[in-house]
Amino acid sequence: MLYLVRHGQASFGAADYDRLSALGARQCQALGHWFASHGIAFEAVLRGTLRRHAQSLAAIAEGHGNVPAALEWPGLNEYDSEALIRTVHEGPLPKPDSPEVYRAHFRLLREALAGWMAGRTAPAGMPSWSDFTAGVAGALDHVRSRHRGDVLIVSSGGPIATAVGQVLGTSPDTTIELNLRIRNSAVTEFAFTPKRHVLVSFNHVPHLDAAERRAWITHA
């Protein structure tokens, strides 16, 4: 089984988003403990190269107790949301410190993603959509061709939604909606053979499935 995990809660709205919050670390520690308690031992681990990916994996490993060293895979890195939004919005963005501004941020992101995926825009410093999807496909191909046991991928919402879209053949609009629904530390499962991946579950948070952890469920 391939387990694709979105990073824990990062520092949305802060000067440096690419850093787990204290809650994000707890989310990932709880996930690692859940994996261990269910007898899941990973044959291999891949992760993106962003700080939040490394910190999330470290917390998962702390909770699990026995996780192999990871292969760093740049194709699992997230898109640059600020560069995307600059293609549809001129000038500085207000700090997302209220529900209204938060919603406005994601409306702009949805619009910007659609333009990028359709090839209408070329956000500064970012790959094309086709190159982005190729990076994700390369990680999936690597898993299929080299492994037979349980594999862990730690990445972000964009690459995970893209992977699901590739497996299911979804439209760009559907891929965007999948992306914006993925929760922090959520697990998406693919069964796989040397020839294909099959979606088993999406956006699952079994490690947070308790009343006392309801407030631990986050999206950014």
Predicted regions and their residues:
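Generic beta-sheet signal
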Residues: 2, 147-155
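Active-site metal-binding loops of divalent metal-dependent hydrolases
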Residues: 8, 157, 203-205
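Loop-to-helix element that buttresses phosphate recognition and phosphoryl-transfer chemistry
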Residues: 3, 8-61, 125-136
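Phosphate-coordination/substrate-recognition cap region in phosphate-metabolizing enzymes
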Residues: 32-110
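Acidic, low-complexity terminal tails and accessory targeting/binding regions
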Residues: 77-101, 130, 145-150, 165-220
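Glycine-rich phosphate-binding loop signature in dinucleotide/nucleotide-binding domains
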Residues: 38-40, 143-148
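GST superfamily/GST-like fold recognition
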Residues: 157-161, 193
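Internal catalytic-core helix/loop-beta-alpha segment
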Residues: 110-146
